[in-house]
UniProtKB/Swiss-Prot annotation:
This is Serine/threonine-protein phosphatase 2A 55 kDa regulatory subunit B alpha isoform. Has an extended WD 2 repeat that is important for the interaction with PPP2R1A. It comes from the Eukaryota. One of its GO terms (molecular function) is tau protein binding. WD repeats lie at residues 11-80, 94-174, 175-218, 227-270, 288-325, 347-381, 414-446. Substrate-recognition subunit of protein phosphatase 2A (PP2A) that plays a key role in cell cycle by controlling mitosis entry and exit. Involved in chromosome clustering during late mitosis by mediating dephosphorylation of MKI67. Essential for serine/threonine-protein phosphatase 2A-mediated dephosphorylation of WEE1, preventing its ubiquitin-mediated proteolysis, increasing WEE1 protein levels, and promoting the G2/M checkpoint. Keywords: Acetylation, Repeat, WD repeat. Disulfide bonds: none annotated. Belongs to the phosphatase 2A regulatory subunit B family. Coiled coil: none annotated. GO terms for cellular component: cytosol; glutamatergic synapse; protein phosphatase type 2A complex; synapse. PROSITE patterns: PR55_1 (PS01024), PR55_2 (PS01025). InterPro entries: PP2A_PR55, PP2A_PR55_CS, WD40/YVTN_repeat-like_dom_sf, WD40_repeat_dom_sf, WD40_rpt.
Length: 447
């Protein structure tokens, strides 16, 4: 399976798993987002309990190719607390919906995290020295009587154990009536967007009390509502361009230079529906759960319930590539509707060179598709393969008929085990995959 480096066949092997082994999972421990920073040295996860955990790549292991995929806890902090909206009598969950890193400009790191209503800018900084020798303070912290001070001394910095501090620098609140589903930092690194079901707002990172509404699809009469915004993202190179996807399977590309309110899109990406596949579930499964620009900015990838599509920004009428993630579930849509799995929101990601796309599935399976060779692979995040450098065996699902020895029947898939969140290191073949409450890290096998 090709990875960040290009067309060579890659064997993926187990590196680490984070999180408790218990079958009885606390709701607060369920991972809700996973994101590498721009260098890939840090990996952040958010959970339903409002916590953010940051892992750091082991520095000494970066040189040893077989241990590059080892990450250890760097910082843990409570990003959001549960709140109550007294005006609407609604509980606001603390669950972290999205995390986005800002590019590093100095020794500190910055990230944005959001729950349903409030976005926060966090500063993550290290301290390994502390000042000592104050004139009015004893070494044990007691204050001295100023009249007893006969000589002035210059405080000095003394080494101390490394301490990582997370401090909230900005809180962006009270701008969304509906639940925030996306945040995306602009390529100017000064502004970012936040999207909820019906509106998209543009913020400046320095200004918390004001945002600009750039998309508003709320109808005058809510009974006429036919679609909602499901995801939004800024173009990686063009700071005036962004896209947003809808529950009807369309993607709109907007140019902020055209007008202040981008209600009229510049481009509309939509694939005509195949009449032979039309069913009661067509509209539900065509809803887009994630949209991601390629690093180059030439393509974008969308994920709907059954497939991943890659679109060329210069061609609106159909995707240039379509990859079936779990087509064998088409015959199971009725039962997936009854158990609400049909509404699961799977995310997708690109590798560093845009040559491979990855997304999750059920039974703790995840899928990779090589855009050059058109080969695909299904792998499993499981504790059975948890010896370091154990090579992952490809898995196959048997849709019907006779099942071969290594195949899994579609009827025996566990729909409670699902991989919704995945992330790919921006420069190396290291991937992070979130199962319910565990974070798996895999890397390519180096001979």
């Amino acid at each position: 399976m090709a990875g960040a480096g290009g067309g060579n066949d890659i064997q993926w092997c187990f590196s680490q798993v984070k999180g408790a082994v218990d079958d009885d999972v606390a709701e607060a421990d369920i991972i809700s987002t996973v994101e590498f920073n721009h260098s890939g040295e840090l990996l952040a996860t958010g959970d339903k309990g409002g916590r953010v955990v940051i892992f750091q790549q082991e520095q000494e292991n970066k040189i040893q190719s077989h241990s590059r995929g080892e990450y250890n806890v760097y910082s843990t902090f409570q990003s959001h607390e549960p709140e109550f909206d007294y005006l609407k009598s609604l509980e606001i969950e603390e669950k972290i919906n999205k995390i986005r890193w800002l590019p590093q400009k100095n020794a500190a790191q910055f990230l944005l995290s959001t729950n349903d209503k409030t976005i926060k800018l966090w500063k993550i900084s290290e301290r390994d020295k502390r000042p000592e020798g104050y004139n009015l303070k004893e070494e044990d912290g007691r204050y001295r009587d100023p009249t007893t001070v006969t000589t002035l001394r210059v405080p000095v910095f003394r080494p101390m154990d490394l301490m990582v501090e997370a401090s909230p620098r900005r809180i962006f609140a009270n701008a969304h009536t509906y639940h925030i589903n996306s945040i995306s930092i602009n390529s100017d690194y000064e502004t970012y967007l936040s999207a909820d079901d019906l509106r998209i707002n543009l913020w400046h990172l320095e200004i918390t009390d004001r945002s600009f509404n750039i998309v508003d699809i709320k109808p005058a009469n809510m009974e006429e509502l036919t679609e909602v915004i499901t995801a939004a993202e800024f173009h990686p190179n063009s700071c005036n361009t962004f896209v947003y996807s809808s529950s009807k399977g369309t993607i709109r590309l907007c140019d902020m230079r055209a007008s202040a309110l981008c209600d009229r899109h510049s481009k509309l990406f939509e694939e005509p529906e195949d009449p032979s596949n039309r069913s009661f579930f067509s509209e539900i499964i065509s809803s887009i759960s994630d949209v991601k620009f390629s690093h180059s900015g030439r393509y974008m990838m969308t994920r709907d319930y059954l497939s991943v599509k890659v679109w060329d920004l210069n061609m609106e009428n159909r995707p240039v590539e379509t990859y079936q993630v779990h087509e064998y579930l088409r015959s199971k849509l009725c039962s997936l509707y009854e158990n609400d799995c049909i509404f699961d929101k799977f995310e997708c990601c690109w590798n560093g060179s845009d040559s491979v796309v990855m997304t999750g599935s059920y039974n703790n399976f995840f899928r990779m598709f090589d855009r050059n060779t058109k080969r695909d692979i299904t792998l499993e995040a499981s504790r059975e393969n948890n010896k370091p450098r154990t090579v992952l065996k490809p898995r196959k699902v048997c849709a019907s008929g006779k099942r071969k020895k290594d195949e899994i029947s579609v009827d025996s898939l566990d729909f409670n085990k699902k991989i919704l969140h995945t992330a790919w290191h921006p420069k190396e073949n290291i991937i992070a995959v979130a199962t319910t409450n565990n974070l798996y890290i895999f890397q390519d096998k180096v001979n």
